[in-house]
Regions:
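Long, C-terminal-biased catalytic regions of enzyme "large/alpha" subunits
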Residues: 1-82
Length: 82
C-alpha cells in the first residue's frame, strides 16, 4: 500500500511510523495516557482502514484516522498534541 506525502511523492505505508509518532506524542504529553497495546491497536486499525480503501492514502487522511482512534480511547488531550 502506498501513501501520498505532503510533497506529493509516494512512499510505502509503514505501520511503525504511526506507532512511533503516537508513542512520542504520548510521552511528550507527560504521564503516559495509552498503553503500548492500545497504540498498536490504533496503528493496526488505521492500516486496516487504509487497505480497505484500495487506493493511495494521503498523510493527512492517515493523521485524521489516527486522531479519531486516539479520541475513541478518551485521550482527547493526546489527540490534540498528535
Amino acid at each position: 500500500m502506498k501513501i501520498i506525502k505532503r510533497n506529493g511523492s509516494e512512499e510505502t505505508f509503514d505501520i511503525q511510523k504511526i506507532v512511533v509518532a503516537v508513542t512520542k506524542a504520548d510521552k511528550d504529553n507527560g504521564e503516559r495516557t495509552l498503553t503500548d497495546s492500545q497504540i498498536e491497536d490504533i496503528a493496526e486499525y488505521v492500516e486496516f482502514k487504509c487497505n480497505k480503501l484500495n487506493r493511495a492514502v494521503s498523510v493527512e487522511e492517515i493523521q485524521d484516522m489516527v486522531e479519531n482512534q486516539i479520541m475513541a480511547t478518551g485521550a482527547f488531550e493526546l489527540a490534540r498534541k498528535y
